[in-house]
Structures are given as structure tokens and as C-alpha cells.
């Protein structure tokens, strides 16, 4: 597996008149390959990455990733795994998916109800706090305040 990454904008060092005219005359992929020493990085999950610098003026890098097995050997086949997707009619899908969907909807409804209860309770408590601050709570106190 190889990945070619390049910067579409030329770097500041390549903006001189001779190099910019060379850039305009020849396509960017036709430039000669300058291979430097590879930088290999090995991670914990046995994937090694190696990078080679192709052309320093264009800033292109080829990155190769290879997954090694448990014993460190190369993978046996280099073919890409083929995924087989079969078209199944909706009528023939198992009923479990419908039951699972209904179960998720039920759980969602319960969560929404609980959230609504919490919101309403918080609103009630805020209203009570404001009324206490103004001296209008508890409601039995209102009868006493009428005579004043």
C-alpha cells in the first residue's frame, strides 16, 4: 500500500525564475526521483511506516504502510480483500432488527420523559426560590399578607 502526498503550491525556494519556468514547462509527476534514506517507524500494533522523500523542491513524500503478522512475516497475499454485499429484500430481513429498533425507541422515550421531569422540577424550584426571595412563599403566607 503506497500513499503519495504532495503540496500543490510550490515552496518559496522553488519560486526563482529558472525553477518556476521549469515547473511550468514540465508536469510535476515527470520530475526525477531523489531517494533519500528511508525513515521507518514501527508502532505497537505491528504496523510499520516508511517514508521516502521524492523531490525536496516539490515537497512530495511516499508513505508505505505494511502490516506484519504476529511473527513479523510479510502478509501472504497482496490482493485486496473482496467484500461481497448481497441485496436482501426488506421483507426477508430478520424480525430481530425491528425489535431492536423498537427497544431503542422505547429507551429513547424513557430518557426524554426523565429529562422532561428534571426540567420541570428545576423550573418549579427556581420559581419557588424567586417567590421566597420576594416574600410570597409559602402560599399560606399570602393570606397573612392580604391583611397588611
Swiss-Prot record:
GO terms for biological process: plastid translation; ribulose bisphosphate carboxylase complex assembly. Disulfide bonds: none annotated. Its main location: plastid. Residues 1-65 form a transit peptide. GO terms for cellular component: chloroplast; chloroplast envelope; chloroplast thylakoid membrane; cytosol; ribonucleoprotein complex; ribosome; thylakoid. It comes from the Eukaryota. Transmembrane segments: none annotated. Keywords: Acetylation, Chloroplast, Plastid, Ribonucleoprotein, Ribosomal protein, Transit peptide. InterPro entries: Ribosomal_cL37. It is found in: Plastid, Chloroplast. Residues 125-148 are annotated as: Disordered. Coiled coil: none annotated. The modification N-acetylalanine is found at residue 66. Belongs to the chloroplast-specific ribosomal protein cL37 family. Part of the 50S ribosomal subunit. PANTHER family: 50S RIBOSOMAL PROTEIN 5, CHLOROPLASTIC, LARGE RIBOSOMAL SUBUNIT PROTEIN CL37. This is Large ribosomal subunit protein cL37. It comes from Arabidopsis thaliana (Mouse-ear cress). The gene is PSRP5.
Amino acid at each position: 500500500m503506497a500513499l503519495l502526498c504532495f503540496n500543490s503550491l510550490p515552496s518559496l525556494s522553488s519560486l526563482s525564475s529558472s525553477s518556476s519556468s521549469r515547473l511550468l514547462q514540465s508536469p510535476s509527476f515527470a520530475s526525477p526521483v531523489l531517494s533519500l534514506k528511508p525513515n521507518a517507524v514501527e508502532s505497537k500494533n505491528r504496523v510499520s511506516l516508511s517514508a521516502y522523500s521524492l523531490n525536496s523542491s516539490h515537497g512530495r513524500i511516499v508513505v508505505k504502510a505494511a502490516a506484519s503478522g504476529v511473527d513479523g512475516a510479510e502478509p501472504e497475499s497482496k490482493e485486496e480483500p473482496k467484500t461481497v454485499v448481497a441485496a436482501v429484500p426488506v421483507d426477508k430481513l430478520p424480525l430481530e432488527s425491528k425489535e431492536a429498533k423498537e427497544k431503542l425507541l422505547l429507551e429513547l422515550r424513557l430518557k426524554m420523559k426523565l429529562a422532561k421531569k428534571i426540567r420541570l422540577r428545576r423550573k418549579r424550584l427556581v420559581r419557588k426560590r424567586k417567590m421566597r426571595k420576594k416574600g410570597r412563599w409559602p402560599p399560606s403566607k399570602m393570606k397573612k399578607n392580604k391583611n397588611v
